[in-house]
């Protein structure tokens, strides 16, 4: 579905939300969901009248299998360049293991991951904080993983991966305790995001936060009062 002009959330993708941006200097994809989503994503691109061979980048907000699962499949089909933050690059390329999630969900991930059919891929582009790619700025937001990022256009849009949650009605929520490698760092990252200005927040899971999204995030943080318990640190 088209969320706003030239920004699509691809319907039916298993796993994390998968976004396609068709405007700007290059067409690009943000995250791919679980393994075996490749044909579904390609068919969506064709259905909206775009050519999959015009896909220039597949940008990973971080390295969990529900975000990177179909990267290798899509790279083979499209030859798009794969981009991920330097801290998560080893996981994508198979040189390091997926992050450890706490609790029963973590055990399920550990047992199921070998059966999911993930194929490692060496990234073409290593992302760093404040880099520009495809008309967006990379914002380093560690905590969920060590290499989590957001993609940001000032005053317009932010793709935030799993830096925070969103419910089915598009209300922002705090990061998951069990799914964050470092919850304190994750909270710092959300505070940093709240200092940016954007109208739409596009999460890795949940519904888009539309219309004054940065103000809604500030309102959420005002209730939580994290600034009092978590001192800011440089990323």
Regions found by a protein language model. Name each.
Residues 1-48, 150-161, 166:
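Conserved beta-strand hairpin/beta-sheet module of binuclear metal-dependent hydrolase folds
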Residues 6-10, 35, 58-61, 135-141, ...:
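Short, flexible loop segments at the rims of nucleotide/cofactor-binding pockets, characterized by
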Residues 35-36, 139-140, 146-224, 229-231:
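Metallo-beta-lactamase
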Residues 20, 126-153:
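Core dinuclear metal-dependent hydrolase active-site scaffold
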Residues 36-38, 46-125, 222, 226-227:
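Active-site HxH/HxHxD metal-binding segment of metal-dependent hydrolases
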Residues 48-53, 131-134, 195-196:
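Glycine-rich phosphate-binding loop signature in dinucleotide/nucleotide-binding domains
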């Amino acid at each position: 579905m088209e969320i706003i002009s030239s920004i699509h959330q691809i319907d039916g993708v298993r796993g994390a939300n998968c976004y396609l941006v068709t405007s700007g200097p290059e067409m690009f994809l943000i995250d791919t969901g679980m393994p075996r989503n490749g044909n579904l994503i390609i068919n969506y691109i064709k259905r909206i009248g775009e050519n999959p061979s015009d896909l220039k980048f597949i940008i990973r907000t971080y390295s969990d299998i529900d975000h990177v699962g179909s990267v290798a499949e899509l790279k083979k089909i499209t030859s798009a360049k794969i981009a991920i933050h330097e801290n998560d690059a080893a996981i994508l390329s198979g040189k390091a293991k997926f992050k450890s999630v706490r609790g029963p969900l973590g055990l399920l991930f550990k047992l199921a991951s070998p059966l999911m059919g993930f194929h490692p891929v060496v990234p073409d582009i290593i992302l760093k904080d404040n880099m520009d790619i495809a008309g967006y700025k990379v914002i380093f937001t560690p905590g969920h993983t060590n290499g989590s990022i957001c993609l940001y256009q000032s005053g317009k849009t932010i793709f935030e991966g799993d830096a925070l949650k969103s419910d089915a009605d598009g209300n922002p929520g705090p990061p998951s305790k069990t799914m964050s490698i470092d919850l304190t760092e994750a909270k710092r990252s959300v505070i940093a995001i709240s200092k940016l200005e954007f109208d739409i927040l596009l999460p890795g899971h949940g519904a888009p936060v539309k219309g004054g999204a940065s103000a809604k995030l500030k309102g959420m943080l005002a209730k939580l009062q994290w600034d009092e318990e978590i001192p800011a640190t440089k990323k």
